[in-house]
Amino acid sequence: MSRKGHIKKRDVQPDPIYNSKLVTKTINTIMEDGKKGKAQTIFYQALKQVKTITNRDPIEVFHEALNNIMPVLEVRTRRVGGQNYQVPSEVRPERRHSLGLRWLVKYTKERNEKTMEERLAKEIVDASLGNGVSVKKREETHRMAEANKAFAHYRW
């Protein structure tokens, strides 16, 4: 246990174009090796492509996609009496966002389109429509939680 008390969470500055903290967090998730400018370019270009594909507000489509990706339940391993149980538990809102963004970026990188902008745009559009690999990951996580519902009483 720490004796110094709780550590304050650093507040993220909203991005200059859409004035959204969620966009900044997404850009930070995309960023590799501290190259934030490149990550911003990728994200903003992807949103432009989303606008051309869907003819809708790209931020609205992005929020819709993220809502379809964010998990509500997950399983956590709990050791009881020498056995490991997969115990379903609810996901905190903050972790929901970070998991959703992480999965979005991870499965975007695994797509086959030529540029990262294209991949991200297509994954956002697919996720907003309810298909796409990142949405499948969420459904798989929920299936695991549902299958292990019997161990819910081990929750802590």
From Swiss-Prot:
Molecular-function annotations in GO: rRNA binding; structural constituent of ribosome; tRNA binding
Gene3D superfamilies (UniProt xref): Ribosomal protein S7 domain
Keyword hit for Ribosomal protein: yes
Gene Ontology CC: small ribosomal subunit
Purpose of the protein: One of the primary rRNA binding proteins, it binds directly to 16S rRNA where it nucleates assembly of the head domain of the 30S subunit. Is located at the subunit interface close to the decoding center, probably blocks exit of the E-site tRNA.
Subunit structure, interactors included: Part of the 30S ribosomal subunit. Contacts proteins S9 and S11.
Designated name of the protein: Small ribosomal subunit protein uS7
Species in which this protein is naturally found: Aster yellows witches'-broom phytoplasma (strain AYWB)
